[in-house]
Amino acid sequence: MGRITASELSWSVKGHRLLDNIEMAAHDGKIVGLLGPNGSGKSTLLRLLAGLRGPDTGTVRYDDTSLRDLGRRALARRLAVVEQDVTAHNHVSVRQVVELGRTPFRGRFDALTDHDRRIVDAALERVDVADKQHRSWHTLSGGEKQRTQLARALAQEPREILLDEPTNHLDIRHQLELLDLLGTLDVTCVVALHDLNLAARYCDHVVILDHGQVVDAGTPGTVLTAELIESVYGVNVLIDREPTTGALRVTYLAAVRETTARKAMQDDPR
C-alpha cells in the first residue's frame, strides 16, 4: 500500500485558477472520495496527482518521494489510473487492453511471461470481463469499456489507484460490484464520484471541492451535512441512516435558486 499527499497545490489556465491551494491526503489502504459539482476541480486534481499535468505551485508526494523525483517507469509500477473516457484502436481486443497493465514490468521488446498471463487472467475474472476478452474494443458498451480499464489497472498490481467517475456508464449491479471490489484491494484509492450515497457507503474519507478549493474534508458522516450539500450543490436534502446497513443516506428534496458558495463568489470575485 502507499500514501498520496498533495500540499499547496494550485493550477491555472490562461490566468484562471482551476485549483487553489489544495491540501489532501490518502493514507495506506483507504478509499478517498473526491466530491463536488461539475467544474469543481475533481478531474483536474486527479490529473495533477497522476503527473499528467504539472502544478503551478505545490507538491504531490507518493509516500515520502516527490512526484517530480519519481521516474515514469517507477510511477507506472506503483500507480494505476482509470480515466472517464479512454479511446483505444477499434481492433484491439479486451485482453490486449488489459495486457497493457503489464507494460511497466517488461522490456520494450519482451513478450508476456506466463506470470504476466496469469495476472491478466485474474484481472479479467475479477471485473467480470473474462468472457469478453477476445471481443474488439469498439464492440463494447460504455460499462464494459470501464470494467476493461479497471482490469488493466488491476493488472499493474498497483499500490495506488486513481479513478475518475468509475461508476459512469455502469448499471447498478456493476457500480456496487466495482466499489465492493475497491474495498477488498490492498491499495490506496482516490476516486472522483458524483453519487453522494455511494461515497457515504464506500469511502473512508471524502474531500469536498467547489470552485477549485477544498470546502471540507473528513469522514462522510462528519462532512456530508444538509448545510454543506445545500451550500455546494444547491439542493435541499434529508440526511438519515439506511435502516438495513446503517450507512448515511442522502435524499434529494428540491433545488435551491442559488448556492451559498456561488453567491459568495459573486460578492468576492477572484
Question: Model-found features: residue ranges?
Answer:
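Conserved ABC transporter NBD signature motif
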Residues: 58-66, 75
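Helix-to-loop junction immediately C-terminal to a conserved catalytic motif
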Residues: 50
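The feature captures the beta-strand-to-loop junction immediately N-terminal to the Walker
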Residues: 35-37
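A short, proline-enriched helix->beta-strand linker immediately N-terminal to the Walker B motif
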Residues: 155-159
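Conserved ABC ATPase "signature" region
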Residues: 99, 114-132
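Catalytic Walker B motif of ABC-type/P-loop ATPase nucleotide-binding domains
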Residues: 161-165, 170
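ABC ATPase nucleotide-binding domains
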Residues: 232-270
